A protein has these predicted regions:
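Conserved catalytic core of nucleic-acid polymerases
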Residues: 423-425, 479, 585, 591-592, ...
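Active-site-proximal helix-loop-helix substrate-binding element of RNase H-like nuclease domains
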Residues: 106, 160-181, 322-455, 466, ...
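Noncatalytic, basic helical substrate-engagement surface that gates or grips nucleic-acid strands
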Residues: 2-134, 140-160, 236-239, 245-253, ...
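Non-catalytic nucleic-acid-binding/docking modules located in mid-to-C-terminal regions
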Residues: 54-58, 91, 100-102, 125-128, ...
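C-terminal polymerase-core module
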Residues: 498-505, 509-561, 728-782, 826-863
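Conserved "right-hand" nucleotidyltransferase catalytic core of DNA-directed polymerases
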Residues: 233-342, 355, 423-616, 635, ...
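Function-dense linear segments that define catalytic or interfacial modules
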Residues: 331-335, 388-419, 435-442, 596-680
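Conserved RNase H-like, two-metal-ion catalytic cores of nucleic-acid enzymes
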Residues: 4, 15-50, 58, 73-74, ...
């Protein structure tokens, strides 16, 4: 028997799109092109082929209005118009299918269901064929027969129905799905059915009378009320029957031989996968790069011979390299290549000066330094180069390598089993050695390619002068770590627990009952059903109880303030008190990981644990910082740029009045309030300054009047007046914004003062809201990115100075505009001058950079 797979293409793409469209995981490639529907679609198509092993396959698509619209003009009325982000993915889905060797088809005046129905009928009539339909559309259940089954897709799986299992589930025959739709209607297709009859009632009628005709032939046996409903809507019922019936005689220009699976066009498929940045699919296609490599495993230190500049790759088991096991190192150049197991590597280091090129130098540097192995001559990191060139960089090198057609196993495939990240397979040294050597080969062979691209994109200086030197600086910060006062954390934890318990009891008293405060559903029922507080629209999961919703309810009931405080303290306790305690290493320190290749603006981020997210604007968050302490006989010192982004804005936009205020060391928010409210500075009150501050920083992020109104809890009209007044007061800012956005549209990207580049694909989108988002990115990136570049330069220069002066001071934390140091008491005065001098003079702008120095016996006091 030959198998035919019949796929509902529209259904698959819609499902894939909406699975992530509003979840925070909306996929785009680095150019901003939406890819979420395509990714899910491609994944499902591959899965179908692997599971079903068909000989024939057709993917059917809708093509505009059909004969059903002629019968009923309102057919499918009320459906939300297809989003532009989904619409643009349809042509590429069809192109992907063609390159996968799969036939797709669409036909004027007919739906995808009708095309599927026509081929399903063929399976029924021909003895040598069986069919499987793939869709989540229940309309297609009517096509189930002896020779046709259906995989009805669910959220994370599917249900397979054949004649027997369908009847067991529904109690009717598959063909009676048409009768069911005729009675109950279908809101998704705007099929009216009989008013007042739902699925449960319709199924009961069909159990008793089999068909729609059977129901109408037995009206006298029904209750008067039911009979009235059916009589009143008889025309609608029969029209609905016609609309729900899948047509099986579509006049198609293709036949069975045309839908036989063909060979893939791997070259074109790979090109598409690279363009879409579907690196996980690349590994499944044939590669152009030779995957064969001699696997030489070093057994004795005498065999190690490195005469030329080489690429290297450190194979590490685990994602947190502060505690992970090093398996070994692969070394590659055009003359020789070999793999050194770690127990051999530990014994010989005299060749390390030849190791010049790698992937994720910081990881290698820190992991080896923990074993007293110093690798200091690396000058090219492919991970950083790829990041600056806007490749989709991940921790696993295989994603980048596969985009260059290197067939390298992914980390998960190598070391994880059962998809559990805590269970590692036994190390197979030959497998490990080959994978590591292929990675080193990729690094070596593409080094010049990346270098040329960096030159072409005017990014080489940024790479060589900032990002590469910074990776070692960050490595030293991670290695040094920051000392934690565990007693202080424990004490704080106990205080938080007591406060949480008191708040819980007070909230229960206000609510009049006990409930799960952390459950949005239960909280929503208490606030909006029981206490009758104003609320938004209720959705399937209940009322929204987000912080934005709660903030709007402040002052309307005492319970609101307590809930906000409860959430704040509870998060601090679980995320920071307990989280930080779990992250403390044997040396009593926390060793975070600074990621250099994550944000599009160039800002650094911190993970495992995140030290940049510890709240400082509330009293409880500030208490967490008390636990960060210096080494013995030392202090914590902080150097913090004052209003650096506003200074960069005044430089870029060339605003004389703002520049003068910075030169005269006038409070910029008071100055702005004075200007926009047109009053002397001594008459500016706290509220005016707060508004001016919100506008100052909002302008940097391209804030809308609605956004400002939300921040300040004022009407959008009032917020618009503040923004308009600001832009009239500082016309240079408006000119700068207009010029920046215009140039971004022309070029497709923006740059920082140090040439960091960010491509903004959102500007090419047809959707107005997405283009607006792109414009905000265009305004913010040059400012925030320049700020990130400046502090990076300062970090490099400070690290150099500390080394030159042979000082014991250690740089231990970076939080956006702030650097934190562990300073011996006897170096306090000297290091304060060094930090301030370097941070303020590392970059020459038309306004002065100002750094505020603070110190104390813990991080909280150094603020």
């Amino acid at each position: 028997m030959e198998k035919i797979i019949l796929v509902d293409g529209n259904n698959l793409l819609f499902r894939s799109y909406y699975a992530t469209a509003y979840s925070g995981n909306f996929m785009k490639n680095s150019k901003g092109f939406p890819t979420n529907a395509l990714y899910g679609f491609t994944n499902m198509i591959n899965k179908i082929i692997n599971e079903e092993c068909p000989t024939y396959m057709i993917v059917a698509f809708d093509k505009g209005k059909t004969f059903r619209h002629e019968k009923y003009e309102q057919y499918k009325d009320g459906r939300i118009e297809m989003p532009d982000e989904l619409k643009v993915q349809f042509p590429l889905a069809k192109e992907l299918l063609t390159n996968m060797g799969i036939k797709y088809y669409e036909c004027d005046n007919y739906e995808a269901d009708d095309i599927i129905g026509t081929f399903a009928k063929y399976c029924d009539e021909e003895e040598d064929f069986i069919g499987t339909i793939v869709s989540s559309d229940k309309d297609l259940l009517q096509l189930i027969s002896h020779d046709v089954d259906i995989k009805l897709l669910k959220q994370k799986d599917y249900i397979r129905y054949n004649e027997k299992s369908f009847k067991e589930a529904y109690g009717i025959e598959p063909i009676n799905i048409i009768d069911l739709k005729a009675l109950m209607g279908d809101s998704s297709d705007n099929i009216p059915g009989v008013k007042g009859i739902g699925e449960k009632t319709a199924l009961k009628l069909l159990h008793d009378y089999k068909t729609l005709n059977g129901v109408y032939d037995n009206l006298d046996k029904l209750t008067p009320k039911m009979r009235e409903k059916l009589e009143n809507d008889k025309d609608n019922a029969y029209m609905s029957y016609d609309l729900a019936t899948i047509y099986k005689e579509v006049p198609m220009e293709i036949s069975i031989p045309d839908i036989k699976l063909k060979n893939k066009n791997s070259d074109k498929l790979n090109e598409m996968y690279k363009e879409l940045e579907f690196y996980s699919f690349l590994k499944k296609e044939e590669k152009k790069v030779d995957n064969n490599i001699e696997v030489k495993i070093i057994e004795n230190t005498s065999e190690i011979n490195v005469q030329k500049d080489s690429a290297y790759y450190l194979e590490i088991l685990g994602t947190n390299y502060h505690s992970s096991k090093i398996l070994g190192m692969a070394i590659y150049n055009e003359d020789n290549s070999f793999y050194i197991p770690f127990q051999i590597l530990e014994k010989k280091h005299d060749f390390l000066d030849k190791l010049k090129y790698t992937y994720d130098y910081k990881k290698n540097y820190v992991a080896l330094k923990k074993h007293n192995i110093n690798i200091l001559n690396t000058n090219f990191d492919t991970m950083i180069a790829g990041y600056l060139l806007e490749y989709n960089i991940k921790e696993d090198i295989s994603y980048l390598a596969n985009s260059f057609n290197y067939n390298i196993p992914f980390y998960d495939e190598m070391y994880l089993k059962n998809k559990s990240k805590s269970l590692y397979e036994e190390e197979d040294i030959k497998k490990t050695a080959k994978a590591a050597l292929l990675k080193a080969k990729f690094i070596y062979e593409t080094k010049n390619i990346f270098e040329e691209k960096l030159k072409e994109e005017k990014l080489l200086d940024l790479f060589e002068e900032i990002e590469m030197p910074l990776s070692k600086v960050l490595g030293d910060m991670e290695y040094n770590g920051v000392l934690i006062d565990q007693n202080e954390l424990n004490k704080l934890g106990e205080e938080f627990k007591i406060k949480i318990e008191l708040l819980e009891q007070s909230i229960y008293n206000d609510a009049g009952e006990k409930f799960n405060i952390s459950s949005p559903k239960q909280l929503g029922e208490i606030l909006f059903d029981k206490l009758q507080l104003p609320h938004g629209k209720k959705n399937k999961s209940g009322y929204s109880t987000s912080i934005d919703v709660l903030n709007k309810l402040l002052g309307k009931h005492p319970i609101i303030e307590k809930i906000i405080e409860y959430r704040t303290i509870n998060k601090l306790y679980t995320t920071y008190v307990e989280g930080l305690k779990n992250a403390i290493c044997r040396d009593g320190k926390i060793h975070t990981i600074y990621t250099q290749t994550l944000t599009r603006t160039g800002r650094l981020s911190s993970i495992e644990p995140n030290l940049q997210n510890i709240p400082i604007r509330n009293e409880y968050g500030a208490l967490i910082r008390k636990a960060f302490i210096p080494s013995e006989n030392g202090i914590i010192m902080s150097g913090d740029y004052s209003q650096i982004e506003l200074r960069i804005l005044s430089h870029m936009a060339n605003i004389d009045s703002l520049k003068k205020a910075f030169y005269d060391n006038i409070d910029i928010h008071t100055k702005t309030a004075s200007d926009i409210f047109k009053i002397p500075t001594d008459l500016v009150d706290k509220k005016m300054r707060r508004i001016a501050k919100a506008v100052n920083f909002g302008i940097i992020y391209g804030i809308s009047s609605f956004g400002l109104s939300e921040n300040l809890h004022i009407r959008p009209k009032e917020a618009k007046e503040f923004i308009d007044s600001y832009l009239q007061t500082y016309p240079g800012v408006k000119q700068y914004m207009d010029d920046t956005i215009k140039k971004a549209y022309e070029d497709g990207y923006v740059r920082t003062l140090f040439n960091r580049k960010r491509t903004i694909g959102e500007l090419q989108n047809k959707n107005y809201m997405i283009r607006q988002s792109g414009e905000r990115i265009a305004l913010n990136t040059p400012i925030q990115g320049t700020s990130a570049d400046i502090i990076k330069k300062a970090m490099i220069e400070i690290a150099k100075k500390l080394e030159q002066e042979k000082m014991q001071t250690k740089m231990i934390i970076q939080v956006h505009d702030e650097l934190v140091f562990d300073v011996p008491n006897n170096e306090k005065e000297k290091i304060e001058k060094i930090i301030k001098d370097i941070m303020e003079n590392v970059c020459e702008l038309s306004v002065p950079l100002n750094v505020e120095i603070a110190y104390g016996k813990n991080w909280r006091e150094a603020k």
